[in-house]
């Protein structure tokens, strides 16, 4: 490589985007060109951000690492999406992550933008040892109650795995019907990488489904509100009545049925 003084700013930038040596970084720091100084400042800011992110991901793996040490190889994180909406199914997902993965930004799905969730959704599916999605339909929610329907969706997700899980990490709940060692973790989607990954799979899968249901029932705006009781959704409910995918046991829907 030629000396840095003979390199253009563009050439220096290209080297900094690889894995520059300490010698190269020192040379950049000593270069008096303003463009090079800006590049080196940006490089170290990005390096520090990557370090902080690596430490955050490491903290998210605390539960998994302890379980791996105890001999549990396949740890399945489980989470749900859609307990609160007035329409559509409750969807659960389970995900078994490898010990080494590259999912920058992995977090509780509620803390991510839609575009970031979509990107991670694809990355998780590509890198996971195993994953599956399960759901419980509105009629099942009405017949059981939302808590039991959520557990049913989670059970279906676990049963859909092609890889046998050795331990389950579940957001807030326990699934006694599954005879697999398990642990419920309050706010698990913010504390466990496996549960965070499952939360993204569940959320994005449900959002996609509500987009499809919007084509069948466009008057309710499901693609936008995902079935939640927004002002526009409630107005459509009063105007158009109850659809086949509304949860009849939920108060606003029940009130509309009582009016009819």
From Swiss-Prot:
Keyword presence, Cytoplasm: yes
- Its transmembrane ranges are none
Supply the Pfam families for this chain.
Answer: RNase_HII
Say if the entry is tagged with keyword Cytoplasm.
yes
Which cofactors does this protein require?
Mn(2+); Mg(2+)
Q: Which GO terms describe its biological process?
A: DNA replication, removal of RNA primer; mismatch repair
GO MF annotation: an example: RNA-DNA hybrid ribonuclease activity
Q: Which reaction does it catalyse?
A: Endonucleolytic cleavage to 5'-phosphomonoester
Residue ranges constituting the RNase H type-2 domain according to the UniProt record: 73-260
EC annotation from Swiss-Prot or TrEMBL: 3.1.26.4
- Keyword annotations for this protein? Cytoplasm, Endonuclease, Hydrolase, Manganese, Metal-binding, Nuclease
> Where is it located?
Cytoplasm
Enzyme class per UniProt:
hydrolase
**Record-linked HAMAP family:** RNase_HII_B (MF_00052_B)
Family, per entry:
Belongs to the RNase HII family.
The task this protein performs is described as:
Endonuclease that specifically degrades the RNA of RNA-DNA hybrids.
* Name assigned to this protein: Ribonuclease HII
Q: Which organism is it from?
A: Desulfitobacterium hafniense (strain Y51)
The gene from which this protein is expressed is rnhB
């Amino acid at each position: 490589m030629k000396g840095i003084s003979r390199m253009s700013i563009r050439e220096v930038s290209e080297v900094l985007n690889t894995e520059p040596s300490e010698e190269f970084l020192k040379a950049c720091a000593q270069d008096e060109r303003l463009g090079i100084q800006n590049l080196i400042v940006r490089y170290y800011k990005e390096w520090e951000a990557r370090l902080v992110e690596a430490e955050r991901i490491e903290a998210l793996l605390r539960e998994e690492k302890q379980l791996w040490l105890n001999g549990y190889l396949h740890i399945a994180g489980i989470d749900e999406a859609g307990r609160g909406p007035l329409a559509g199914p409750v969807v659960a997902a389970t995900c078994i992550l490898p010990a080494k993965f590259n999912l920058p930004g992995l977090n509780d799905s509620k803390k991510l933008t839609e575009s970031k969730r979509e990107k991670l959704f694809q990355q998780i599916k590509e890198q996971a040892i195993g994953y599956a999605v399960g759901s419980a339909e509105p009629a099942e929610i009405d017949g059981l109650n939302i808590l039991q329907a959520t557990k049913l969706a989670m059970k279906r997700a676990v049963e859909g795995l092609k890889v046998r899980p050795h331990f389950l990490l579940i957001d807030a709940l326990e699934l006694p019907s599954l005879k697999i060692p398990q642990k419920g973790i309050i706010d698990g989607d913010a504390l466990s990488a496996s549960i965070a990954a499952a939360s993204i799979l569940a959320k994005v899968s449900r959002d996609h489904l509500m987009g499809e249901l919007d084509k069948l029932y466009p008057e309710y705006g499901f693609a936008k509100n995902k079935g939640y009781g927004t002002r526009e959704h409630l107005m459509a409910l009063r105007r158009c009545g109850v659809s086949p995918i509304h949860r009849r046991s939920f108060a606003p829907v029940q009130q509309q049925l009582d009016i009819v």
